[in-house]
Amino acid sequence: MSDSPLIAFPRGCITGTFIRRVKRFSVEMETAGAGAPERVWIHSNNSGSMLGLLRAGAPVLASPAANPARKLKWTQELAGLDGMWVGVNTQTPNRLLEAAFHAGRLPWAAGYTMFRREARCGASRLDARMDAPQDSGLPPLWVECKNVTMVEDDVAAFPDAATERGQKHLREMMEIVRQGQRAAMFYLVQRADGHCFGPADYVDPVYAGLFYEAAAAGVEMYPHRALVSEHGIDLGPLLPVVPPPGV
């Protein structure tokens, strides 16, 4: 990956080692650098289980908070695992989707020229809506983003904890397709060792069933590998989707 990824981390990031996680959204780390090590609390916006990533002594990279008045001055961006970085910031998929759209790096969104964040769809809001010029004949394209940090036997898998909210999103996407519009799931695999993608039926069998039901109904599934480094996050290749059991 180049030193100029689609999402570049701001200046002033710190690195160190993981100590513990408290109350889902707070992580204690010990900083590394020229000075004496210091223990600091940082914010984690990842409410998932982060299976396999919360290991004492594991590397951590955190970015400075945009708001200097925030109680926790840092946000965890990366966790180290077996010599690689794993992206754990759950805002990254949304940001990368928008950046890739404007950079023309989403072949599946070719012809779309307008991008709206947090677009209202009925009684819900979805992460993005893309629109094309009226004379293009292309229907609106609705996109929901998911962050993927779990890999088992080379298969990147989502979710890492049971998610009724995620199930709801798949049902909403199927309804959009029934209305004649496009609906897509953007799964960002923020680690290098996932070579294909599938729903984690061993974590949430309901979600896994809905995933394949949605795919069969016409919901488009786009699992992209992210290119993750200490410089930032870039968009990598599409990964193949594991077929449903028995196929």
Swiss-Prot record:
UniProt superkingdom: Bacteria
Pfam families (UniProt xref): SfsA, SfsA_N
CDD domains: SfsA-like_bacterial (cd22359)
A single MF term (Gene Ontology): DNA binding
InterPro entries: SfsA (IPR005224), SfsA_C (IPR040452), SfsA_N (IPR041465)
Assigned protein family: Belongs to the SfsA family.
NCBIfam families found in the cross-reference section: sfsA
Name of protein: Sugar fermentation stimulation protein homolog
Upper taxonomic lineage: Bacteria, Pseudomonadati, Thermodesulfobacteriota, Desulfovibrionia, Desulfovibrionales
